[in-house]
Amino acid sequence: MLCFVRFQAGFVRIIVAARKRFRYFLMAAEDRSEELSSNVENGSCNSNEGINPETSSHWIENVVKVRKPYTVTKQREKWSEEEHDRFLEAIKLYGRGWRQIQEHIGTKTAVQIRSHAQKFFSKMAQEADSRSEGSVKAIVIPPPRPKRKPAHPYPRKSPVPYTQSPPPNLSAMEKGTKSPTSVLSSFGSEDQVNRCSSPNSCTSDIQSIGATSIDKKNNYTTSKQPFKDDSDIGSTPISSITLFGKIVLVAEESHKPSSYNDDDLKQMTCQENHYSGMLVDTNLSLGVWETFCTGSNAFGSVTEASENLEKSAEPISSSWKRLSSLEKQGSCNPVNASGFRPYKRCLSEREVTSSLTLVASDEKKSQRARIC
């Protein structure tokens, strides 16, 4: 309890002393402000007189700093009324030609004339709304001068597109085919024209290649209905067109036959079936199994076997009967048209090999009988 009472008494003493010091500082500040005001008025400043060393630092912080007087270092020349009148006359005569206005006035430089004109024009624009029309004559502000063209400008694209003349070969093709220049290809060969025998049989390069291969292989077949020549059908104008990077041959039919025979229709349908088979099985390593739709035998394993028999062995009636039965089975009928063609080819090859082994065994038996 005694400690607490002593602490409380000491704290009260500190507060009372702080109040006394604060009152003293306030009184001293009022006296200092009065002295400063009197010194500023009289032009004398005796700051060290009547100041205690304890309060000197505090007064230095609170002293109002006097701003340094502003001195104009740049001498701005004013425009007289005579110079301004000459300026207005020169603007009416020369517009924004500052060099000519400088010669007309004679006392101002071009830079000064330009700055004066900018200020004058802005002032005229502000006073244009408030000014009455009859009081003061309006001064016409000259339009700004056009910008100088650059001496060395950057290269720019020409506004007119460059039109390139088509090559002579292309123009010659246009006259013959009467087709637009943007789609025609610049190279057309006679081989592509002669590939197709009729417009119905080929319309692209893939079909034309298939047609040429069939024409070459038809020499080995024994067909009852020969193909028609190009001279019989008639020359048709053919134009080559590039679509998505591929060359397509388009044949324009000059005249179509009025009526088709039954044989021609069968031949055309069989050719379409053959082309579909060629397109599907071109990449197969086992080969192509073709149906005998054109009325002729194919170049498959059956015909090869028959040719080998004709060249090598003597004619045997039983073997030829078996081969003829196999050829009849491979003819064009709806049953054999469907199914997996390589599998059918394998079956036919097995039958042919079995028939060949039988023929060879018969020959050996006959030779043994003759030797005995």
UniProtKB/Swiss-Prot annotation:
UniProt-recorded name of the protein: Protein REVEILLE 7
Disruption phenotype: No effect on the regulation of core clock associated genes or on the hypocotyl length. Rve1, rve2 and rve7 triple mutant has no alteration in the period or phase of the clock.
Composition skew (Basic residues), residue ranges: 145-155
Tagged with keyword Transcription regulation: yes
Extent of the signal sequence: none
Lineage of source species: Eukaryota, Viridiplantae, Streptophyta, Embryophyta, Tracheophyta
Locations listed in the record: Nucleus
Pro residues: compositionally biased ranges: 156-169
InterPro entries: Homeodomain-like_sf, Myb_dom, Myb_dom_plants, SANT/Myb, SANT_dom
Induction pattern: Circadian-regulation. Peak of transcript abundance near subjective dawn. Up-regulated transiently by red light and far red light.
